[in-house]
Amino acid sequence: MAKQTSDSSTEFKAIRNQILEGDFKPFYLLFGKEHYYIDELCKLLMDSVVPEDQKDFGQIVYYGADVSAARVVSTARQFPMMVERQIVVVKEAQMMKKIEDIGVYFEGMMPSTVLGICYKAPNDPTKSGRNIDKRTSFYKQAQKAGVVFE
């Protein structure tokens, strides 16, 4: 496990409290080597955004290796069916090809959708993998669009 910092712990608690208070942002980018925090915030979002009895219609979960950015954007831009709000989550987003293409969603986000991207960087330096590049326009747009947690 990556070294826990007080900054990430404090930020985790602040985001957790916002979610528990029902203050949902339209976009969450949860990334980095702190897999525990990513999993906990993702689970909390999935448990909180849509009531349990509406999850069949209001909760969509994709896995990065199995979905394109275009499909994620298309789903997130759809109006929720038979529910007030929907949550679209991409788990293992580090496996996606062209994750930065999700950036087009920021131009026309749906107020009835919460989009969560869970991107886990490898903890083991011997394993290949990458983290989100903070210099990209995708990262900068994500910061403006919602919550970015590392």
Label every PLM stretch briefly:
Residues 1-150:
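Conserved beta/loop motifs at nucleotide-recognition and modification sites
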